[in-house]
Amino acid sequence: VDLMPLRENMRIEDPGPVLKAASGAAGIFACAASLLGAPSGFIGKIGVDSLSRMVTETLRAQNVDISHVIVSNEYQIGLAFLEYLPEGRNYQYYRNRSVGSLLRADELDEGYISGAYAVHFPGMLLDLTEEIRGACVQLVNLARKHGVLVSFDPNIRRELSADPAARDRMLWAVQHSDIVAPTLAEGQTLTGKTSIGDVLHALHAMGPRVVALTRDKDGAVISMDGKVAIAAGINYAPLDPTGAGDTFAAALCVGLQEGMSLERLAMFCNCAGTLVITQR
């Protein structure tokens, strides 16, 4: 769950109204895929607290299948406080041993996963607990066993990536994915390259067939099967950029499933991501 001050430049400790919203990269992805017309499901673990119920009700309202969401009384759902400050966005996470981070590999349903077109997971999960890391590895293994595409968004959060091994875990995920959708900055961090062409080449060399680089106001670049398509930036002042990358990644999977041309796919993903920034 995200909690966001409604007043610009307001810090969490300041008095004033705060907006709460069901969030999380994987949940946003699932909702976006559903809104874009694809059947989608969410695999995870929630608590018995009221905010956990808010999350499941949000998923249900967006027609996301929640039949594989486990309810546990072990812990409560994680929180993220988001500040919009003059120096940029700042996250403060309260998710140490949060219930979602305790999903285990043995709690995944192989039959459910085998029936998917693609599975998707964000990189921040790899920085939380041994349990969720094991679940991510099992998700990838089961998907590849059954010919299901693996989609990965590095979604690097500096606040969660203090572990020196974090980069190695991200690289493992890229190497075992069919589709990767980092920002250009994340791609540069993962590859050590600078130019768009070099970043694309280096990421493809790790294994993914489809590489998409988002560039905020400058649009996006998608590369697949030796071809590249560029979507120009859309001139719109963002109200709230939260979820734009997750929505872009969802549109990428939906567009691939629908067999869109590379040029149309780039435009489709870029437009979907841009729509998200027009509201909180």
Indicate residue ranges for each PLM-predicted region.
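Conserved beta-alpha-beta core of the PfkB/ribokinase-like small-molecule kinase fold
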Residues: 118, 124-201, 218-220
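Conserved N-terminal subdomain of the carbohydrate kinase-like
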Residues: 39-123
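Structural alpha-helical scaffold elements that stabilize or flank donor/cofactor-binding regions
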Residues: 111-112, 172-173, 204
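Short, conserved phosphate/pyrophosphate- and ester-handling motifs at nucleotide-, phospho-/glycolipid
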Residues: 33, 183, 245
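Short beta-strand scaffold segments in enzyme catalytic cores
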Residues: 31, 79-83, 219-222
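Glycine-rich phosphate/adenosyl-contacting loop at the front of the ribokinase-like
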Residues: 1-64, 237-239
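Conserved phosphate-binding/catalytic region of the ribokinase-like
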Residues: 141-145, 192-280
